[in-house]
Every structure is written in structure tokens, then in C-alpha cells.
Amino acid sequence: MNKQIQTEADELGFFGEYGGQYVPETLMPAIIELKKAYKEAKADPEFQRELEYYLSEYVGRATPLTYAASYTESLGSAKIYLKREDLNHTGAHKINNALGQALLAKRMGKKKLVAETGAGQHGVASATVAALFDMELVVFMGSEDIKRQQLNVFRMELLGAKVVAVEDGQGTLSDAVNKALQYWVSHVDDTHYLLGSALGPDPFPTIVRDFQSVIGKEIKSQILKKEGRLPDAIVACIGGGSNAIGTFYPFIKDDVALYGVEAAGQGDDTDKHALAIGKGSPGVLHGTKMYLIQDEDGQVQLAHSISAGLDYPGIGPEHSYYHDIGRVTFENASDTQAMNALINFTKHEGIIPAIESAHALSYVERLAPTMSKEDIIVVTISGRGDKDMETIRQYMVERGLAND
């Protein structure tokens, strides 16, 4: 494995040619303050102890690494292990980062938070930590996503957050990020922007990756305990890329195949997809340079996925870099492939995954049978499917797989 891989952003915040700080001048003081505060917190054993305390006592970490015996047998394939981020408090990986950033904001003396959310999971995680630490929170959420995720909207409001509907553009995650950034610019003195994915201006991609890396660190120690060796392949779904970077990062310099699974929506032969790597090109959005779905004139295109958490038109700068150097392989799954995998997996394992996670499972169902039965695959179940029950029900009813 190539040990020359760049695993930290350079002093200007770039991974290779991706990353940076493409923000208005008015935001630079806040960005500089955040970078300095994070560097100090990262080196402070007391901050790390506090983070570990809440991850253990509040979130419920470590999450299990479960051998999927029935699923493995049904595929007649390599051994499949599940990293159970669905078992975290709030039901997804998002809490790992929300908790870390809330502690950081508290350390910086910020009493208010602003966040964006797509599927609502990051919004719920942010509202949860805001309630825990007695902070005010404003969440921007696309109007389309609000329709798809009513349950999570109510959860956020019950937890005390103010949810603001974003009607601009497509009314999805990308538009919510725009509004959250605008809000931060005008409230920068007392507000921390709790960014939910591994993107945005430096130092956000690094901060989010570091707080999510607990996933990969646990996988490493758990698989060594269970199997006495590292896995042959690791698979995670990818939107902006936070669960995937947290899963992959501790293995970047190991001899382990890493697969990120993008959302192909209605198919990679249509324009209704979220294939930032698969069909995109480098560009700048939301303060960072990364792969984007854009036209020849550099206009960012609308992303589509049945999963509200994957319909983002970009993929974080570190993933963009790992794609270019060939360290991570990017595959995809369509809406139909993901839903079929979700139904199949649920029937075998008694675990209903989030539709996001089902994209990763769809690729596992293609990959695992091509490997030997002695091989080991780990797939990150990034969240549970409670939030998606209405979408799943509609999908099955429309296809005669369930009664209306």
C-alpha cells in the first residue's frame, strides 16, 4: 500500500487539489478562529476525555460489529460484518460529529448553533446535543426533504430546535447548506455552524472526519479481535461523505480495498442521479473544491436519490483526492437496487437499515459473491430505517410487494 498518501490537509486546507477556503471575506475570521480552536482541542487530553465520556455514556459507543450469518449464507459469499451505527443514540452516525462539534462550540464560548440537514438525521443529532448542552439551534432543511421526513422534523422541534424550510432551488440538502452558510455569516459572533458532512471550507472536512473516525477505529480493533486480521474490503454509502470517510480513514494506509457507493437515482444513464464522482467533475461549492455534478458551464446540477441523505451534488474534498489517486473505488446503486437490497437484507437479518445504508448493501450483494468464502467484508450500516418507513411502504405498495 502506498505510504505516500496525503492524509492531512496542507496549510491552505487542500487534499491534493481539493478543499481550500472559498468563503466570503466576512467569514474568514470565524474560519481562522475555528481552525485554531480545533487544533488546541485536538491536542487537549481533557477535551478528548470529555468527548469519549459522552460517546460512551450518552451515544452508547462502541457500536457492535455484527457477523451477518444469514445474509452471508444467502449470498454464498465472503463473510459479511455489519458496523452498527444504526444502534447509536438518535439512530445514525451523525451524532458522533454533532457531539464533537457541540463540545468544540462550548469550548469556544458559542451559545448558539446553526445546521443544515437532508434526511433530518444530522438535524436530529444537532438538536439532541443542543438540548443536552442548553444551546439554541436553527436548522435549515429543504422543503422537499421536509415532506419526505416529517417524523424527523417533529423530533427536532420536540428537542427545541427551530426548523426553517428552504424553498430555493430544488428544496433539498444543497439549498439548505446555502442558507445555513448565509445565516452563519450574519450571526458569526455567537453562533457555530455545525456542518454535518465532510465538506465545506477547511477546517470542516478535517473536523468532521476526525469525529467520525471513531467508526473505523472501532472496526479495526473489533475485526482484529474477531478474525485476527484486517478485512479484505470495506464498503460504505456516500453522499457528502461523512460516514464513509469515518469508516475508511483509519484504513487508508492498510492493504484493504475501500468502496464508496454513490446514489445512481433513476440510473446512471439518466440525469436523475447523485453521481458526483461517477458523472461529475471538479468545481467549487459551499466553500470547497471537490467533485460536483455540473454542466459544461460549471452550473451545479440538481442531484436525485430516493434517499434524502444522498441527494447532494458534491462529494467532500478528501474523497475527491482519494478517487484521483485510486485509493478508494467509487461504485453506485440506483434507487431500485438500493430498495431491493434493503428488502432482502431486512428479511435475512431482522435489521431495517436506512435507505442510505441500503446503497452500500446493494454493492455488497454484487461484490461478496465474487470473493472467496474466507474473505471478509465490513459494511457500515450508517443508520436505521425508522425515518424511511413511509418511503419504503410507498415503494412496496407501488410494486405490489405490500398492501396499501
UniProtKB/Swiss-Prot annotation:
Xref: Gene3D superfamilies: 3.40.50.1100
Gene that encodes it: trpB
UniProt xrefs under InterPro entries = Trp_synth_b_CS, Trp_synth_beta, Trp_synth_beta/beta-like, TrpB-like_PALP, TrpB-like_PALP_sf
Q: What does this protein do?
A: The beta subunit is responsible for the synthesis of L-tryptophan from indole and L-serine.
Task: Tell me which CDD domains the record gives.
Answer: Trp-synth_B
Instruction: Give any Gene Ontology cellular component.
Output: cytoplasm
Instruction: Give the protein's recorded name.
Output: Tryptophan synthase beta chain
- The record lists the organism as Staphylococcus aureus (strain MSSA476)
The cofactor named in the record is: pyridoxal 5'-phosphate
Its family? Belongs to the TrpB family.
